């Protein structure tokens, strides 16, 4: 009996280690998202998908934004190009080789804020060839490590298609409960013209000082970007690979709304009784899908207003890469 019990315990331990190894298997992910001109008359939801940024992995901000350390007083941005003098105030975020040590999970705390350009380029990549590290977090790869060149060239030749985002990264795959979504955003920032809910901005404080009720001045709050494409992509293992998309594509249009008034003076009751007129409006077009996929296969998520091409590839696991980054053989990580 004791021997059978010992065998059973050993089997359970082996299975648990096997499941853990499978759950932590690393894969390479490549994503291409494009907008297409459509004559679709489909009615889209009035409310955009809520963009969750409190628990996501952000691989894009450290590349396209200027990292600013939040301090009691205004500080200069921590540039992404190494400059010892310019970055002396934020040296704790820099490695000795000049590369940024900003954690892609840093937006899960209040340590790092970013200033962004008005338009984000479609091609997102690291400055050089990158590889994941054992027990590390997802890592952005260079554009040269991607494999979608011919696909992108073919789709770009189709009339009405416009590239929004192309990026490649490596990440460990975990169960759904342990997975953390990847933040995807791209295109134009509409925050200077529209609110997140789509309403046209009539009067805006921007970053100028404004007077409060007792006559003193306070700074207007920082305006969060309203990106043309924004949302998350979650990939996880549950015997098979699954992807979950929660993306908004924002497009300028027109909508019957109460006549616009001064944002500072309008009341809810007044806006409800005001006559409706055709008003500029920022539409929110959702791409929400949950799909089971197979590794190595190229999958296309179709939509009337956009398209998404994704491939999840098996790769040499980080421990093997660290020993020989030039290895040509691919280590098998399971029948996914």
Explain the meaning of each model-derived region.
Residues 2-8:
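Sec-dependent signal peptide recognition
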Residues 4, 27, 155, 169, ...:
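Aromatic-enriched hydrophobic runs in primary sequence
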Residues 10-11, 21:
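Cleavable N-terminal signal peptides
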Residues 16-18:
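N-terminal signal peptide c-region/cleavage motif recognized by signal peptidases
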Residues 23-284:
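Extended, low-hydrophobicity segments enriched in charged/polar residues
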Residues 275-336:
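Long, compositionally biased interface segments
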């Amino acid at each position: 009996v004791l021997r059978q019990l010992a065998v059973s315990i050993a089997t359970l331990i082996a299975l648990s280690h096997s499941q853990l190894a499978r759950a932590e298997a690393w894969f390479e992910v490549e994503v291409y998202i494009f907008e297409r001109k459509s004559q679709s008359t489909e009615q889209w939801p009035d409310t955009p998908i809520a963009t969750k940024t409190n628990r996501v992995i952000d691989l894009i901000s450290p590349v396209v934004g200027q990292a600013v350390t939040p301090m009691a007083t205004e500080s200069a941005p921590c540039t992404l190009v190494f400059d010892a003098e310019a970055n002396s105030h934020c040296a704790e975020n820099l490695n000795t080789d000049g590369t940024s040590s900003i954690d892609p999970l840093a937006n899960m705390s209040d340590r790092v804020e970013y200033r962004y350009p008005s338009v984000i380029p479609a091609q997102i990549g690291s400055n050089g060839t990158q590889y994941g590290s054992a027990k590390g977090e997802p890592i952005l790869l260079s554009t040269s490590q991607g494999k979608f060149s011919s696909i992108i060239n073919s789709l770009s030749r189709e009339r009405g298609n416009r590239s929004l985002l192309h990026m490649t990264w490596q990440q460990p795959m975990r169960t759904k409960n342990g997975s953390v979504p990847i933040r995807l955003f791209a295109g134009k920032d509409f925050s200077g013209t529209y609110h997140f809910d789509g309403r046209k901005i009539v009067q805006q404080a921007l970053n100028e000082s404004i007077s409060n009720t007792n006559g003193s001045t306070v700074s207007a709050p920082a305006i969060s970007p309203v990106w043309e494409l924004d949302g998350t992509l979650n990939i996880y293992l549950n015997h098979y690979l699954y992807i979950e998309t929660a993306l908004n594509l924002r497009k300028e249009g027109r909508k019957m709304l109460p006549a616009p008034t001064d944002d500072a003076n309008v009341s809810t009751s007044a806006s409800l009784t005001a006559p409706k007129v055709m008003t500029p409006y920022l539409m929110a077009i959702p791409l929400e899908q949950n799909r089971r996929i197979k590794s190595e296969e190229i999958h296309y998520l179709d939509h009337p207003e956009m398209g998404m091409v994704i491939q999840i590839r098996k790769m040499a696991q980080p421990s093997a890469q660290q020993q020989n980054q030039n290895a040509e053989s691919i280590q098998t990580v399971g029948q996914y």
